[in-house]
């Protein structure tokens, strides 16, 4: 069942690329269908990921929500960095 779900997702991404390339839609989308498809497929393969919100303890930048970095605001060598803008 899991393999079938994955194949359906891949087919959906490929069909979306095909439609975007052949449609008269946005030129930006026409120029970058492969890049978009690659990022989307990569996200689908990783699955749903919870991000760490602002001002919550973190260990590295990748776990923070978008536009946030894992850093300290008080001292450079702190032991408890948090996700901050």
Curated annotation (Swiss-Prot):
Q: Mind telling me how this protein is modified after translation?
A: Contains 4 disulfide bonds.
A GO term for molecular function: ion channel inhibitor activity
Q: Which InterPro entries match?
A: Conotoxin
Q: In which tissues is it expressed?
A: Expressed by the venom duct.
Q: Domain annotation text?
A: The cysteine framework is XV (C-C-CC-C-C-C-C).
What Gene Ontology cellular component terms go with this record?
A: extracellular region
Query: Do the record's keywords include Heme?
Result: no
Query: What is the organism of origin for this protein?
Result: Conus capitaneus
Per the UniProt record, one Pfam family is: Conotoxin
What the record says about family reads: Belongs to the conotoxin O2 superfamily.
Q: This chain belongs to which protein, by name? A: Conotoxin Cap15b
Q: Which residues form the propeptide?
A: 24-49
Signal peptide location in the record? 1-23
Supply the source organism's classification: Eukaryota, Metazoa, Spiralia, Lophotrochozoa, Mollusca
Sorted alphabetically, the keyword list is: Disulfide bond, Pyrrolidone carboxylic acid, Secreted, Signal, Toxin
The modified positions for Pyrrolidone carboxylic acid read: 50
Which cellular compartments is it found in? Answer: Secreted
Q: Chief subcellular site?
A: secreted
């Amino acid at each position: 069942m899991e393999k079938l779900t994955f194949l359906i997702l891949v087919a959906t991404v490929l069909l979306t690329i095909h439609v975007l390339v052949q449609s008269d839609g946005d030129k930006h989308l026409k120029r970058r269908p492969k890049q978009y498809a690659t990022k989307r497929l990569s996200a689908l393969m990783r699955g749903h990921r919870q991000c760490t919100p602002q001002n919550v303890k973190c260990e590295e930048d990748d776990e923070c929500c978008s536009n946030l970095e894992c850093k300290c605001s008080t001292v450079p060598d702190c032991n408890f960095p948090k996700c901050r803008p």
